[in-house]
Amino acid sequence: MITQDKDFLKNTAYPLLKSNAEFLLDYMVIDPRNNYLVTGPSISPENSFRHQGQEFCASMMPTCDRVLAYEIFSACLQSTEILNVDASFADSLRTAISKLPPFRISTNGGVQEWFEDYEEAHPNHRHTTHLLSLYPYSQITLNKTPELAKAARKTIERRLAAKDWEDTEWSRANMICFYARLKDSENAYNSVKQLLGKLSRENMFTVSPAGIAGAGEDIFAFDGNTAGAAGIAEMLLQSHDNCIELLPCLPKEWKNGNFKGLCARGGIEIDASWKNSQIVNAVLKATAPIEFTLRLSNAKLYCWKLNKKTFIPKIKDDGLIYISMNKGDNLTIIIP
């Protein structure tokens, strides 16, 4: 939960999540070939593959479906635990999650886009829906799944290197988000420049270029603006896996700067400033009771204050700082 708003969860989000999960549980089947719980026939949006000399789009359990099913089941399960409801339904979700197929790495080194290792019909395709696992979700991360993170990078590199890659405003914004999660500041920044350069107009509106997906002329598409902003935010702050990290993907071109009001998962609003690529001041404001870990380089160099009183953080050997805050608390971190 981003805000920990239990009323919203109970009255709006959980009913929606539950109906989604119920649909999937009814729709998905056990594949007799491998005993995995799968969707299908289904597609990896707008993309296709080659099989036995022909081009197809539909198959059983494309990777994007696995990603979305896991997220829906997991979010729904977490909601039942927070709200203390639907115990038997929660058991069915746990069973379903245990039967989902694992991610697979293709012979080309990338994350498989389909359950089978099919040949890509369009290696230059603009869609990378299977990488929802990397962003915005965190099923693939540098820390938890390093081999899959390496495969995700390979998928990105193969797309970008393909002849006539379909470089649209939103596919380029995706690259910002993907590279931010991989903490590759140089490539993330390059995609920011591409998005704000050839894929934007003077008013900063992003466009889908003529000639891609049948477009006869440039088309304004707002998703480049929103996804681009999200990617830049991800370069400055990450908070998946209950770990908040400041400046996780800071390019050298942004060695001095600041941000205000970025929100971390769980109910934290953050202001921060930095010089020479190092945080010099940060304020974390808790909008809900929260326990989390903070990743901050050279943490022992800082002066820490919780509600204006000196605070001694618990810094572990792995460099993570374990912090507990109540709603309304303010944690200040500053270079003395």
State what each model feature region is.
Residues 26, 186-336:
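Non-catalytic C-terminal accessory modules of carbohydrate-active enzymes
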Residues 32-34, 39-44, 64, 129-131, ...:
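Short, solvent-exposed loop/turn segments at the edges of secondary structure
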Residues 19-79:
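Acidic/histidine-rich catalytic neighborhood
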Residues 50-52, 147, 283:
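Short conserved micro-motifs at the rims of enzyme active sites and ligand-binding pockets
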Residues 1-6, 11-15, 62-239, 243, ...:
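Active-site core of glycosidic bond-cleaving carbohydrate-active enzymes
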Residues 41, 116, 138, 296, ...:
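Pocket-edge structural micro-motifs
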Residues 58, 124-126, 260-263:
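Short Gly/Pro-enriched turn/cap motifs at secondary-structure boundaries
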